[in-house]
């Protein structure tokens, strides 16, 4: 372990290197769980943020992400639809709130945000969700500084833009957008005063070194992303990665635990692929540092545990729903 536990509890770092992270990621599991749980207890209460995700516009994306069924390059048989009307989205947000969610995430299958009627509707949706007393998150691809500013003015809590994988493995997953494009988008979001939601996916054919490299980029962002979604690949027929094998749940536990050690105060979100995890594996993820989940029976194009099953699980675990999200003040972003 590159740092003693006492040192881990004293400081939050932004200078982790890949070798240190690999050493943590490869620790004996029982030691890794102990270290991550100790950090988690120090910096976070045992409560879980419930984020509900809704696909506002599905399919037809111009990017060639090899894991995604919404890409125009995918042969997946998904049900595409144009952008929902504001009223329809607000109805879904109200359902999510009534079920206990405190964040409503809205997804658009776009390469980038484009000005016009659709963007104006997005701004209206953001304002409407905030008026419900919920946090509002958007994921819609790249954006300009002006668009980020307008989203901030509308009250957007967070913008999601994942890195997906390591800089080294990235070219094997997507070629229509560069890694630097993603980092530039994150910088614009941060500089507009919007919280950053940024994570990645495991199970894309990457090595353990790639996972460490992804975590190196995330943990050296200053400040750290407020939310860090950790996804496991859901291999969908018709996508470029349809034949990839499911990851072992221990790999997800290791990724969650390492992310918690590196980014002590971030919301570590147990995201896509959670339905494949056993109840026991999910509990270990919560113990090791996961303190946010996607809540509701559907993500963008994949299934998820139901509201009812998640409430039952959280009650068994003994954690509370999270209502105390900390909004960071506007601060310039550095990489």
UniProtKB/Swiss-Prot annotation:
Q: Which reaction does it catalyse?
A: (4R,5S)-dethiobiotin + (sulfur carrier)-SH + 2 reduced [2Fe-2S]-[ferredoxin] + 2 S-adenosyl-L-methionine = (sulfur carrier)-H + biotin + 2 5'-deoxyadenosine + 2 L-methionine + 2 oxidized [2Fe-2S]-[ferredoxin]
A GO molecular function term, named singly, is: 4 iron, 4 sulfur cluster binding
Q: Which GO terms describe its biological process?
A: biotin biosynthetic process
| Presence of the UniProt keyword Iron-sulfur in the record | yes
Which residues of this UniProt protein bind [2Fe-2S] cluster? 105, 137, 197, 269
Please name the CDD domains in this protein's record.
Answer: Radical_SAM
Superkingdom to which the source organism belongs: Bacteria
Protein EC? 2.8.1.6
Name the pathway it acts in. Answer: Cofactor biosynthesis; biotin biosynthesis; biotin from 7,8-diaminononanoate: step 2/2
The Swiss-Prot or TrEMBL record lists the needed cofactor(s) as:
[4Fe-4S] cluster; [2Fe-2S] cluster
Q: Which UniProt keywords apply?
A: 2Fe-2S, 4Fe-4S, Biotin biosynthesis, Iron, Iron-sulfur, Metal-binding, S-adenosyl-L-methionine, Transferase
Residue ranges of domain Radical SAM core in the record: 46-274
SMART domains from the UniProt entry: BATS, Elp3
Q: Which residues bind [4Fe-4S] cluster?
A: 61, 65, 68
Query: How many and how are cofactors bound here?
Result: Binds 1 [4Fe-4S] cluster. The cluster is coordinated with 3 cysteines and an exchangeable S-adenosyl-L-methionine.
Tell me the function of this protein: Catalyzes the conversion of dethiobiotin (DTB) to biotin by the insertion of a sulfur atom into dethiobiotin via a radical-based mechanism.
Family per record: Belongs to the radical SAM superfamily. Biotin synthase family.
Which proteins does it associate with, and in what oligomeric form? Homodimer.
**Protein name (record):** Biotin synthase
List the source organism: Prochlorococcus marinus (strain MIT 9312)
> Lineage of this protein's species?
Bacteria, Bacillati, Cyanobacteriota, Cyanophyceae, Synechococcales
Give the gene name: bioB
């Amino acid at each position: 372990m590159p740092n003693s536990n006492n040192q881990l509890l004293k400081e939050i770092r932004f200078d982790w290197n890949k070798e240190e992270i690999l050493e943590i990621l490869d620790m004996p599991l029982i030691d890794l769980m102990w270290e991550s749980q100790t950090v988690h207890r120090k910096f976070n209460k045992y409560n879980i943020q419930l984020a509900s995700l809704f696909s506002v516009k599905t399919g037809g994306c111009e990017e060639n992400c090899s894991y995604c069924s919404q890409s125009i390059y995918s042969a997946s048989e998904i049900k595409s639809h144009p952008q929902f009307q504001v009223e329809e989205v607000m109805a879904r947000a109200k359902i999510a709130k009534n079920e206990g969610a405190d964040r409503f995430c809205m997804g658009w299958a776009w390469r980038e945000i484009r000005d016009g009627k659709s963007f104006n509707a997005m701004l209206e949706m953001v304002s409407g969700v905030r008026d419900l007393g919920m946090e509002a998150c958007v994921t819609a691809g790249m954006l300009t500084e002006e668009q980020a500013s307008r989203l901030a003015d509308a009250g957007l809590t967070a913008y999601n833009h994942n890195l997906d994988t390591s800089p080294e493995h990235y070219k094997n997953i997507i070629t229509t957008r560069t890694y630097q494009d993603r980092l530039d988008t994150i910088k614009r979001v941060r500089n507009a005063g919007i919280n950053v939601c940024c994570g990645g996916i495991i199970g894309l054919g990457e090595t353990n070194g790639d996972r460490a490299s992804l975590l190196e980029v995330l943990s050296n962002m200053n400040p750290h992303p407020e939310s860090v979604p950790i996804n496991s690949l859901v291999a969908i027929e018709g996508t470029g990665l349809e034949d990839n094998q499911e990851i072992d749940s221990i790999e997800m536990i290791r990724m969650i635990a390492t992310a918690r050690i590196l980014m002590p105060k971030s919301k570590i979100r147990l995201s896509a692929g959670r339905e494949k995890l056993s109840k026991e594996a999910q509990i270990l993820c919560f113990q090791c540092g996961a303190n946010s989940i996607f809540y509701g029976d559907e993500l963008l194009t994949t299934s998820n545990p139901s509201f009812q099953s998640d409430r039952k699980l959280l009650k068994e675990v003994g954690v509370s729903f999270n209502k105390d999200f900390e909004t960071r003040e506007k601060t310039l972003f550095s990489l």
